[in-house]
Amino acid sequence: MFDFLNEKDRQPPALPEGTVRRRYSIEGQVQGEGFRYRARYAAQSLGLTGWVENEDDGSVTLEVQGDPALFLKLFALIQRSDYIQITSLRQRDLAPDPWERDFRVRGCW
């Protein structure tokens, strides 16, 4: 009756071949400039999933999942703003999340 309650018991959905999940720590002029919302729009337009969040130290963390060939396009779309300036980018590969279905902005009302 309430199958969603037993979701942990279900098999995870299959991911497209080549799916990668990557976490980026981004520094520069990235807070207060619309970075998170630009990232969400760009990720959604490219069919990527994940999340983006401001950090207390002024950096932004972006976790993205999908075709890694699209990750460079994602950053190109984000940087089309005159206000956003990325000065440092660190990345770390993670295990893909088969349950994730969208891209979210974290830490907002």
Q: What are these regions, as identified by a protein language model?
A:
Residues M1-W109:
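Intrinsically disordered, low-complexity, mixed-charge
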